[in-house]
Amino acid sequence: MIEQTLDIATGDGEMETFICRPERGPFPAVFLLMDAPGIREELKDMARRLGTVGYYVLLPNLYYRAGRDTIYGPSVLEEGSAERGRMRAVRSKMSIPPVMNDIAGMLAFADRQKEVRRGPAGFVMATA
């Protein structure tokens, strides 16, 4: 299994993205979009599980526009915590059109990777 964190070019800058994939390839790409609490170890574990069954998984930090300090601690899941308040302040500034542009950047990136095989993609983003 290969794991790496890369910056993917978007219209608004460089989007930090966790990538997990088996060796060799090509493999179908999965865009694993974070939920409201953002990137955390549980989501990386989901990416790893998908990678072990033959997918090239991209897990982008969709909060990258607010800076690199948008990876929150475990208390982000606790109502009333300072981390949750920080996350909500960033999340409240998000809108769909920029995220769709981020997806376009991810598609362009995936299209350039020899380890990625073209195929359908699915998207989900929940809220906290």
Can you name each region flagged by the protein language model?
Residues M1-A128:
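N-terminal cap/leader regions of alpha/beta-hydrolase-fold enzymes
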